[in-house]
């Protein structure tokens, strides 16, 4: 657990629906200002072994999961679970058979992997798992996504020189075609794992985007935030 002591930026704000806002664009614009650019981003073309910068990486498929070897150290995904809820309230088993992408952050001594299952069918094609690997401590942190994108990103939200990760939880579509996605802040610990970033009062930091199917109707959009700073500066 990571504790933020004496934080003065906590805001709980729900938008006013009297005026239209494209909250998806507001979120994207905000996140772009906080992104940490990777030293290298590699999209795997099917290879099982490759060298990226000075790092040697290989992987193989197992009966349940994959085994990744990073500079001689083995990382086995079998039996691992996500830190975040992926769909609704439950964590997910890391069910993968393919290494899709590698992101290297040299200054942060981190690697980020996007892991998938191929060939996929139905809802399984909307799922991916993300592994953060600390090159110094060899610690692993797992997250999952469903219908919330395949991109891997690290951020600097707190100006504390500790990289952050933003988990995404999809809460499903209601009868009116309205979706809810919750974003939760995780930050790197001194041990190399990523854990929820919390206030001195043990409150986590999050924001929710509530939107209609395919973002077609802005009248149904809402944005709720309890974050370290105000994201929706329009105030509506």
Name what the model sees in each region.
Residues 5-6:
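C-terminal motif of bacterial Sec signal peptides marking the signal peptidase cleavage site
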């Amino acid at each position: 657990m990571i504790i933020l002591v004496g934080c003065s930026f906590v805001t709980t704000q729900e938008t006013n629906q009297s005026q239209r806002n494209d909250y998806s664009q507001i979120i994207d614009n905000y996140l772009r200002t906080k992104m940490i650019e990777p030293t290298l981003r590699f999209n795997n073309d099917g290879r099982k072994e490759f060298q990226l910068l000075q790092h040697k990486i290989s992987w193989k498929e197992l009966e349940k999961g994959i085994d990744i070897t990073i500079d001689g150290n083995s990382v086995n995904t079998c039996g691992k679970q996500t830190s975040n809820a992926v769909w609704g309230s439950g964590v997910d088993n890391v069910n993968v058979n393919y290494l899709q992408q590698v992101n290297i952050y040299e200054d942060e001594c981190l690697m980020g992997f996007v892991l998938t299952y191929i060939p996929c069918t139905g809802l399984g094609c909307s799922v991916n798992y993300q592994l953060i690997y600390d090159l110094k401590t060899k610690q692993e942190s797992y997250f999952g996504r469903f219908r919330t994108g395949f991109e891997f990103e690290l951020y600097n939200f707190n100006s504390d020189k500790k990289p952050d990760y933003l988990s995404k939880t999809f809460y499903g579509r209601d009868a009116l075609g309205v979706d809810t996605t919750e974003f939760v802040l995780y930050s790197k610990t001194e041990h190399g794992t990523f854990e929820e970033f919390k206030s001195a009062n043990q409150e986590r930091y999050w924001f929710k985007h509530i939107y209609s199917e395919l973002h077609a109707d802005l009248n149904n959009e809402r944005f709720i935030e309890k974050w370290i700073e105000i994201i929706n500066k329009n105030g509506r």
